[in-house]
Amino acid sequence: MTENGFRKIALSMQGAIESAHMGHPDFRANGKIFATLHDDKKSGMVKLTPEQQQDFLGEHPEMFVPENGAWGRSGCTRVILNKADEEAVGEAMTLAWQNTKNNAKKRNLKT
């Protein structure tokens, strides 16, 4: 998978926009990041739950690894682009997008 392939999947999510922070592209829904492309041009990140992350690490250990530190422990998952396939990334990206949408609904219920 290429950076453009990753970008295309991210932007196919309803309401997704491309923005940037810390010098690299990110993808947002409801103002919240659900995926990013890393500076190294070799990897991206999808924001999964820890449980979802474990599923993807178990099913596709060559494609997905936890991000470093607390981000990884919270579910942020690195996608190794040259090992990734469109179907698996699409599934992970959809979950990351849904997580962002669900978190937005929870925030709205609290206000």
Question: Where are the regions that the model predicts?
Answer:
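Charge-dense, helix-prone N-terminal extensions
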Residues: 1-111
